[in-house]
A protein has these predicted regions:
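Flexible N-terminal pre-Rossmann segment of NAD(P)-dependent oxidoreductases
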Residues: 1-10
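Short beta-strand-centered segments at strand-helix junctions
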Residues: 71-74
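Active-site region of the double-stranded beta-helix
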Residues: 17-65, 78-118
Length: 118
């Protein structure tokens, strides 16, 4: 598993892909996502060891436009995936500069990546 260094990054790009291969979590704070202009898929997995994604526990939810999702500290997740469009505006609520001091990101090997089939 490749561990990414996101020091200095403050956001991410949301595209039209439906492949799940990146997971992140924060130890010290919750994260909130507000879907502004469309439905989205969001994947989550329960907290666990920092060096291992619990693939057997990953769940994907379809979240309607206008819904606020709150993720507790330690929950594996990543940005939302578009449902019916190629792009999606999402308000992400996190403490300032969080990615510099509290963001663990892992990328799954190709064989362990999931694909959303709608």
């Amino acid at each position: 598993m490749e561990k990414l260094n996101l020091h200095g990054k403050t956001g991410f790009i949301i595209g039209g892909t439906r492949g799940i291969g990146t997971y992140k979590y924060h130890n010290t704070c919750a994260e909130a996502m507000l879907l502004l202009d469309g439905d989205a898929y969001i994947h989550v997995a329960p907290a666990g060891p920092a060096d291992r994604i619990p693939y057997d526990a990953v769940e994907v939810f379809r979240v309607p436009k206008g819904t606020m999702v709150t993720l507790r500290p330690g929950v594996w997740h990543h940005g939302p995936f578009c449902v019916d469009t190629d792009s999606l505006q999402t308000l992400i609520i996190l403490p300032e500069r969080l990615y510099a001091y509290d963001c663990t990101v892992l990328t799954a090997p190709e064989a362990d990546k999931l694909r959303i089939e709608a």
